[in-house]
Design a protein with these regions (language model features):
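Glycine-rich phosphate-binding loop
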Residues: 53-95
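C-terminal binding/interaction regions
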Residues: 17, 102-167
C-alpha cells in the first residue's frame, strides 16, 4: 500500500467465466485496501501475453499474483515458471470433475517452481486474497493490524452464531464425560 496508484497484486484468470469465483479474491483485496490489477490471460489461447505479463510483473511493481483457472488449469504454474514473485493458484470448479482436475493441475508442480494452492472454488479465491494480504503484511504493518481486526471479527461472528444454540443442561448426577 506504499503507492496507492500502483497495483501490488494481480488477479488473473484463464477465462471470463472464472470471474464468478475470482471476484472473491478481489473482494478481499478491496476490503483491505490493497490496489490490484485484474485481467483475463489464457495460458493456452494467449501464451505470449501470459509470458509478457509474467516476465514484467516485478518491474511493474507487483508483489504477488493470484491466478485462477479451471480444467487443465495451467495458468498458475506457467506464470510461476516465468516469474520469481509468489504465485497463488486458485482451482476453479469445472463441469467435468467438480474442480478436482483444476486442483491437481495446479498443486502438482515440479520441485523448484512453487505455486501456493488454495481450495477449489469460492473459498479458495477468498483465501487467495487473504494469503496475498498476509504476504504484504510482512512489510506493511497497517495490513497486519487490519488482519488482526479481521480475525477478531471472525471470532465475534462465531460467538454470535453460538448464541441461539441451546446448551444441554445436565442433571446434578450426570456428567459430560
Amino acid at each position: 500500500m506504499a503507492n496507492e496508484s500502483k497495483p501490488e497484486v494481480a488477479v488473473v484468470m484463464g477465462s471470463s467465466s472464472d470471474w464468478e469465483t475470482m471476484k472473491r479474491a478481489c473482494d478481499i483485496l478491496d476490503q483491505f485496501g490493497v490496489v490490484y490489477h485484474k485481467q483475463v490471460i489464457s495460458a493456452h489461447r494467449t501464451p505470449e501475453l501470459m509470458a509478457e505479463f509474467a516476465h514484467n510483473a516485478r518491474a511493474n511493481g507487483l508483489k504477488a499474483i493470484i491466478a485462477g483457472a479451471g480444467g487443465a488449469a495451467h495458468l498458475p504454474g506457467m506464470i510461476a515458471a516465468q516469474t520469481t514473485l509468489p504465485v497463488i493458484g486458485v482451482p476453479v470448479r469445472s463441469h467435468a470433475l467438480s474442480g478436482w482436475d483444476s486442483l491437481l493441475s495446479i498443486v502438482q508442480m515440479p520441485g523448484g517452481i512453487p505455486v501456493a494452492t488454495t481450495a477449489v472454488g469460492n473459498s479458495g479465491a477468498t483465501n487467495a486474497g487473504l494469503l496475498a494480504v498476509q504476504m504484504l503484511s510482512a512489510f506493511e504493518p497497517e495490513l497486519a493490524d487490519k488482519l488482526e481486526d479481521y480475525r477478531n471479527e471472525l471470532k465475534e461472528k462465531v460467538a454470535e452464531s453460538n448464541a441461539p444454540v441451546s446448551y444441554t443442561h445436565l442433571r446434578a448426577h450426570e456428567t459430560c464425560a
